[in-house]
């Protein structure tokens, strides 16, 4: 069964506790069952860059392929970070469509979770506490 938690902080002094506060709220939803859990993380928007967050159950192979393909096909600086079964790609806004096409063509087992200047979405199957720990 689906359950959604959200936290809109009006008190900026709590910003550094956002992850902890949201995690506790999500874990409280555990009694709904081990279906799936996820979080959306918003950062400061970038003017000229966007982020693509992808997820793969075959991350060892997919992410190695992803990094290799992107470095081969793009002629500019690229920032990729890996977080368990997710990868976040930061690139110039003008390259986002091209990167999405590369992902679709070369890494069909990867799923695009989010695209945007400030958002990263992480989603997994399992108990919320397990998802948060990853």
Which stretches of residues belong to each language-model region?
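N-terminal segments that mediate ammonia production and transfer
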Residues: 1-134
């Amino acid at each position: 069964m689906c359950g959604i938690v959200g936290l809109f902080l009006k008190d900026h002094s709590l910003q550094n506790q956002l992850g902890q506060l949201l995690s506790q709220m999500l874990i409280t939803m555990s009694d709904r069952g081990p279906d799936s859990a996820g979080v959306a993380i918003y950062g400061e928007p970038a003017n000229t860059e966007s982020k693509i967050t992808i997820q793969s159950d075959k991350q060892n192979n997919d992410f190695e392929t992803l990094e290799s393909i992107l470095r081969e096909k793009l002629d500019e600086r690229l920032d990729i970070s890996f977080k368990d079964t997710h990868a976040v790609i930061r690139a110039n806004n003008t390259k986002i469509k091209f990167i999405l096409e590369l992902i679709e063509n070369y890494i069909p087992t990867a799923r695009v979770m989010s695209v945007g200047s400030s958002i990263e979405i992480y989603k997994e199957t399992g108990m919320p506490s397990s998802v948060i720990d990853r």
